[in-house]
Amino acid sequence: MENENKPNVANFEAAVAVKDYEKACSELLLILSQLDSNFGGIQEIEFEYPVQLQDLEQEKIVYFCTRMATAITTLFSDPVLEISDLGVQRFLVYQRWLALIFASSPFVNADHILQTYNREPNRKNSLEIHLDSSKSSLIKFCILYLPESNVNLNLDVMWNISPELCASLCFALQSPRFIGTSTAFNKRATILQWFPRHLDQLKNLNNIPSAISHDVYMHCSYDTSVNKHDVKRALNHVIRRHIESEYGWKDRYVAHIGYRNNKPVMVVLLEHFHSAHSIYRTHSTSMIAAREHFYLIGLGSPSVDQAGQEVFDEFHLVAGDNMKQKLEFIRSVCESNGAAIFYMPSIGMDMTTIFASNTRLAPIQAIALGHPATTHSDFIEYVIVEDDYVGSEACFSETLLRLPKDALPYVPSALAPEKVDYLLRENPEVVNIGIASTTMKLNPYFLEALKAIRDRAKVKVHFHFALGQSNGITHPYVERFIKSYLGDSATAHPHSPYHQYLRILHNCDMMVNPFPFGNTNGIIDMVTLGLVGVCKTGAEVHEHIDEGLFKRLGLPEWLIANTVDEYVERAVRLAENHQERLELRRYIIENNGLNTLFTGDPRPMGQVFLEKLNAFLKEN
């Protein structure tokens, strides 16, 4: 009995075979839900595989994906299959895992299934699918129109037929954590230009997969267009209308300022905030220092550990079984304490912060750049940022509170090695180039640049991708993408524990940083290992942060590129000139540049918030 509700591939296949489609869909959703919980891993999903694959993890994953894709093909090719309005929402929340099942199998996409929906035998273009007029066909089309699809889609036509279904598909297509291939990347880029003005027409979130709203909000940052964050403004408007109409939301009356221990109150809403997470390492010191002027109340999830909780004068778990209850809890804390400041060190990784950013909870509301981008919210006045991380203020809807560059000193990672045996190779036959990157930061432009580096360098190079989030069924797809540009000149290492990840980079001679979304922790890891590399700067903070860090570390400015051509040229120079590269590495090692990131004066944030509060009180 205990295995009955466990995800099981054979159970799914059996239900498909006997055309018990209700059971088949339930079994499929169970498998997709488990993949979601596992971040793509296939553990806890029961399926038999040939014993020959026992120790071949990647081949086992491809085998799993191929079996799943074959059964899904049979299921969705049958015209008898009907998916309800509720069913399509459930499938679209998990569409990214359907996409990976096909992308990591030989099928690549589900276009062969979409072709069975075509009702126009005399079409001129096989990539044009002419559906019948039933809603059922449109629903099935939306579920299987995946990021890798080559089929033509007219969003205007779909919007005219069903705005909510079209919006739901746009949500799903922006939700994957890897949108790196030119097909997938261009699809998202098109949506980011088309979608904002249409999304803004929706009255509420009721008939769209709002559970993946934070993916829409956050993943737009990995695009390359200047207006890529506009989708946030539209999403914010829909969220605001939703909480007013569906929750009966009323903003807090913020004229009353309360005091605890004779200090005004700052309420801090947290996302990922524990001692092993980068947000804790980058933003805890400034909050501790702010307690000189404010009584700090932290609000977060059970993942906030003891170290995270101790940053605050008091800490509360956010109570509530749903978003309405969570928002009401946050408002009650702000109300009962007369919060003067409502502050979020990061926003975009969790639904609660995004919803809260569309409410008025305190007279002064601010974020920091734990996820480095604007909110486009009508309710956030300020962004806390170190001065040297700013590229262009025009990237923000908020007013920037620009702090000195040492005002947010980092806390060293608890996992950082105590001692490093530096690997300094004098004249390597092959220059190993390390790339620390999550899957979200990979894109065709970055890979084209790496290909140009390989082709132009007079020395042989090999790229080692130390990948974050490339787990389970994600990895074969990511690896194929990397190999499609770099072939045997690259090794794609799947997501690995921190020490193993450092070992991959330790064996490299230099590094290059991804763009347009650069690195913070990757640069810290680079310098920890006595490595140097090249970065590309730009207008957005998530581009410019690399430049700021390189300059703080005392690296020469020629390693900071303004254009892709400069990036390629400088990476080639660093790869070819062994002596110059080793001198730079020795400089970094001997001067312990990393120490500059861990030292500084964390007091300015609290001071500038106090100034803003005093100005507010004077005016009111």
UniProtKB/Swiss-Prot annotation:
Annotated cofactor note: Does not require a metal cofactor.
Pathway(s) this gene product operates in, as recorded in its UniProt entry: Protein modification; protein glycosylation
Signal peptide feature range: none
EC number of this enzyme: 2.4.1.-
Catalysed reaction equations from the record: L-asparaginyl-[protein] + UDP-alpha-D-glucose = N(4)-(beta-D-glucosyl)-L-asparaginyl-[protein] + UDP + H(+)
Keywords associated with the record: Cytoplasm, Glycosyltransferase, Transferase
Top EC class, one word: transferase
GO molecular function, one term: UDP-glucosyltransferase activity
One Pfam family in the UniProt entry: HMW1C_N
Domain of life of the native organism: Bacteria
Keyword Disulfide bond: no
UniProt-annotated location(s): Cytoplasm
Cellular component, GO, one term: cytoplasm
GO biological process terms on file: protein N-linked glycosylation via asparagine
Family statement: Belongs to the glycosyltransferase 41 family.
Biological role stated in the UniProt entry: Inverting glycosyltransferase that catalyzes the transfer of one glucose moiety from UDP-glucose to an asparagine residue in peptides and proteins containing the NX(S/T) motif, resulting in their modification with a beta-linked 1,N-glucose. Likely acts as a key component of a general protein glycosylation system. Also accepts UDP-galactose as a substrate donor, albeit with low efficiency. Cannot use UDP-GlcNAc or UDP-GalNAc as substrate donor.
Protein name stated in the entry: UDP-glucose:protein N-beta-glucosyltransferase
Organism of origin: Actinobacillus pleuropneumoniae serotype 7 (strain AP76)
